[in-house]
Amino acid sequence: MVMTDPIADFLTRIRNANMVYHDKVEVPASKVKRAIAEIFKNEGYVKDVEYVEDNKQGLLRIYLKFGPNREKVITGVKRISKPGLRVYARKEEIPKVLGGLGVAVLSTSQGIMSDKAARKAGLGGEVLCYIW
C-alpha cells in the first residue's frame, strides 16, 4: 500500500505508542523524520532517538519519555501542513503553540527547525506539525 503522508504516519505511531505507555516506538526512517525526532528530543518530549540499519531504508527507534508517576510528557501531536493543504508561515506569522508551551516544527530553506529557532534565524516556512 502506498503511503501518501509519511510524516502523519510517523506522528500517529508516536501518539499511539504514547497513549498506551510504550517505552519505545519504531518507525521507517527518512531524513525529515529523523530531523523532526531530533527536535522532539532537543525540546524534551522524547528521551532518545537512534537510527537502526535494516538493509532497507532503516528504522528510527524513538524512546518515549514519561514522568516519575508515568504521566505523559507528550500531551498531543498534530499534523498541520498536509499533502492536500500545505500551510506556510512568514517569519512574522510563525504560530505559538499553546501560548509558547508547545513547539511548532517548520521546514525552512535552512532545514527543519523548531519555531523558536526559526524566529531567531528570521525564517518562515512550511508548518509541519505541533507537539505539546
From Swiss-Prot:
GO MF, any single term? rRNA binding
According to the UniProt record, which cysteines are disulfide-bonded?
none
> Is RNA-binding among this UniProt entry's keywords?
yes
Give the record's keywords alphabetically: Ribonucleoprotein, Ribosomal protein, RNA-binding, rRNA-binding
Q: What biological processes does GO assign it?
A: translation
Record-level GO cellular component terms: ribonucleoprotein complex; ribosome
Show the InterPro entries listed in the entry. Ribosomal_uS8, Ribosomal_uS8_CS, Ribosomal_uS8_sf
Subunit arrangement? Part of the 30S ribosomal subunit. Contacts proteins S5 and S12.
**Similarity field:** Belongs to the universal ribosomal protein uS8 family.
Functionally, this protein is described as follows: One of the primary rRNA binding proteins, it binds directly to 16S rRNA central domain where it helps coordinate assembly of the platform of the 30S subunit.
Protein's name according to its UniProt entry: Small ribosomal subunit protein uS8
